[in-house]
């Protein structure tokens, strides 16, 4: 019989997988011409995994890693979107942007042995 899993070890492993997924997502976005502005920005009770820019577009990116791309897409619920929106507003309050900046909330879904799927305008900020 196996001993019960250590909750802290499981949390560390999950955190490590999340960091790896974010790094892979950032690589995929950079190959598309995006430039990173921030990683793991936290404020106002929310967090944004990546904030990237390409031209006039600023994208607030949620990265989800799951066993399948479909499971990753389902993992972004209304509560997560609301928390991300609060954090995005906090980031915007701290940074001056050009008047013609285009703001988006994107998602990147990561699954094993698959290239990350970038979904622009995944939800409203």
UniProtKB/Swiss-Prot annotation:
Which HAMAP family does UniProt cross-reference here?
UPF0102
| Name by which UniProt lists this protein | UPF0102 protein Mpop_0474
| The family this protein is said to belong to | Belongs to the UPF0102 family.
Q: Which Gene3D superfamilies match?
A: 3.40.1350.10
One Pfam entry name: UPF0102
Q: Which organism is it from?
A: Methylorubrum populi (strain ATCC BAA-705 / NCIMB 13946 / BJ001)
From what superkingdom does this record's organism come? Bacteria
Q: Which InterPro entries match?
A: Restrct_endonuc-II-like (IPR011335), tRNA_endonuc-like_dom_sf (IPR011856), UPF0102_YraN-like (IPR003509)
List the GO molecular function terms: nucleic acid binding
